């Protein structure tokens, strides 16, 4: 023992336990046997009949050596590895392949391999061994002299022969109904095949293979990796489930199958993906985090004298011992509670229960669990494990016989360990409560989990580390069971400076809310994390062993039932993200092909040597699942980064074109995507790949030209808006064209909001009929950087409509709010940036639901038979009708998608027929309505010159004619009334005449605002009066007898005028409209309620009592004019414009006419409406008046009741 030990329980190296007996083969523990004679079980002698240490060690050794040559190893490493592999699988002694078969057979028992299958497999394996030795020798010879042509020829020939031989041999190891006992053989053979296929990628080109041959071998490696992985997992699960039983003994066998085939099969399968040299082009560090359980520490001595004879049930043991999926953790302290069993002088102090504390990698707090019975102990032993790793346990299981039966217990344990920070310093702690006179049996963990090699001491060659200890409620039910993790899973999450580092996500220290740890599918080397909603998975810490300036890329192995955006945070700051595709369908099982890699190519650094790193997923639709196996950190060097960027750019460029025609652009490649690929190429290093960059740039330019050629939009790059009325974009005021920025490479547009939804912001263009093909689907698509309430329409037979609100992205630059720029202030698109949401799609197709809030959008429209005479074309409209609305969009395209077939063809034919039927019906209706409307309009004027109104034409008649005109349906598109529709020409013709009538009528009426459409403007008011809406009319309401309304009007002396008033009187009294000059020449129109009798109260006054000497106080010059000045002032207001829609708002309204395209109240507000007739009770009175001066007064009043005035007109008589 070491003199420097800290206490009496700590020693250097393993403790030796003296043997006390050699009679372990048989045990007689019956109550009537003499205890001192019968309880003789040799210490140091393992008699577990299920264990085959040599078989397990072979699997452990091979997996351990493979972990050292993952990725692209050094040539010397590879030669040494193949020498080791051939020596392990084809040694000079007994055939390991046969041992593999026997080992599984012994565990499963009920399923044996037939002699013929066994003999065929062994013979074929022997042949493979010879082929491998031959290949290994040729490989070593060629590696010694790679330029030797003969060596190169020999190795190539032997490689091809061996690869073909093993490809055809593997089916012999998966014979039907014998897959389970052959599983270890199958896994080892599959491993050999995949390693061999890797060599083609490593050396094939040097051996003289063509790039096509090398690529073929690579594709076979990928295909067989999936096939072999799924086979191994499937038959492992099948074999395990077959062993599920009801007793403790069946659980022991079940657990051994789980443990031994994890070591010999699943551990290999977990490493298969890392053989991919294109994914792992440099040495790679992988980690196995799965747990395996050694057998319970109870005496096993035949069917009658073993602990499991009276142990707990299968399910009780499974529930008590096997932990639920959890984050990776390790022990920090063990407290053991001891109880005593005694029969006479025979004493067994046994492990009755324990408390363990454990921690996670850089976790801030510890957790603890309690097992067994911890009350009333005779002693308590505390064993610290802080910064120590236990690599071996030697346990002493005891049996104490009595008249009531045998009591089993664990009476001693030696923990061999190393210091985590000083692995060459070996230490040990032990639990030894004492015993006397009992039978004992040694349980050495090395028997079940042997070291990777016997050529080194155990403290250097160990394969596993103790991670947990569990047991049943009592030691009789289930003795303590040790749980172990593979030594490859470090306990610091250290990132290597010269390797790709794989870190399973279960090695995080804290789960985020919404994340669960689920059992691994068998091929991941451990458990995995799962989320059903967006958010971070877990919080991890990593440690660097090198300079902080080293840059990295992150890669995540994931599975998902939905497209999603995966992000990475470093040191708490979210700075990197990427959009990735779904890998599986909802409800499907997790298989090897369910997993894919999400690579975030942006390079980053760590701010500190110990930094946090978090993987998360942005919000995705409910009902979906996302699983993450691990993240990987890949070193970025200047050369590696340039090569990686070049490869990525090459793939991106190649992906633009179809596989059948390398000069044909894929339909689903958007114009925006081409721009982004061009950015990718332009950012390639001139120093490392100038020639390749030039070649790729020419291909991208060609793709851009193809994109321009197929785009049917005029001026897609927004050189102008409303610049040419016959082509290109037409838009409202306020739209701005912006030059390229960090998001768009070319021009884009900004659409602002509007304060009135009846005057929306709009941008539109028509695709001419001549550009379209019959029975073809077309697609409008583009890129929206940011929008709110953006409405998009495609209109032909009917309207395709979608409203998109796309939240603007956060700053794409790591330094938030600062956009990198070039020397001249241009956007620096090569600066490191976040890869933010570039591939979300919003595709609104027939029968499908559109995904909103996506930067990419697309709408489809189907075109039936084209007709150049009708020239329907397709209207493309962008519109915003809310104050908060806005949009920033570009890279717009309208392209031919595909010809219509099947149901789509039938659907468009039905839509076309329905539209044509409606059109024909509308033509017949329009012909009739137009004739009636034209007659009404013509009746307003004296002749067809439309420059002089009939003498009896009043405002009501004009409104009536306007009503007839507005019966013409579909003059403009209801979606955007600035766009003319089918009947625009005839509507604008007649409406122009109506405007002229209004203009002439207003010029003839000297009184301003005589219809009160502008409230009380131009009227002088005394007392309380009001202008109200009555039946869609503006009417003047006087309800107090002292109220007065007047207007001074300038007239022409010696000319005749007609005063015409339309009004309604309620209640008693009179309503009066008086016209007079300054002192005399007064006349009045009187309105009474003719329903009432002509009897008035004594206090009732009449209009004759009104003073005629009213002052003009309050009149404004703006409301005074001669009739010709009034005409001049309104000339522009009513000037017809045949090229623009109507903007006039008439006074009287009626319900909107029925439009087949739907009601649009804004169309009504702009004059596209009917007008109500005068309500019952209104009468029109008039008188002739001949002024003698240039000014007259119009006064309105009443004596009592309510007087309602609809209009007041003073019309100049014709000469």
Curated annotation (Swiss-Prot):
Q: What is any one GO biological process for this UniProt entry?
A: sporulation resulting in formation of a cellular spore
From which source organism is this entry?
Answer: Bacillus thuringiensis subsp. morrisoni
Q: Does the keyword Transmembrane apply?
A: no
MF terms from GO for this chain are: signaling receptor binding; toxin activity
- General remark: Toxic segment of the protein is located in the N-terminus.
The family line of this record is: Belongs to the delta endotoxin family.
What job does the chain carry out? Answer: Promotes colloidosmotic lysis by binding to the midgut epithelial cells of insects. Selectively toxic to Artogeia rapae but not active on Plutella xylostella.
Instruction: Note the Pfam families from the entry.
Output: Cry1Ac_D5, Cry1Ac_dom-VII, Endotoxin_C, Endotoxin_C2, Endotoxin_M, Endotoxin_N
Q: State what protein this is by name.
A: Pesticidal crystal protein Cry1Ka
Query: Keyword Endoplasmic reticulum on this protein?
Result: no
What UniProt keywords apply to this chain's record, in alphabetical order? Answer: Sporulation, Toxin, Virulence
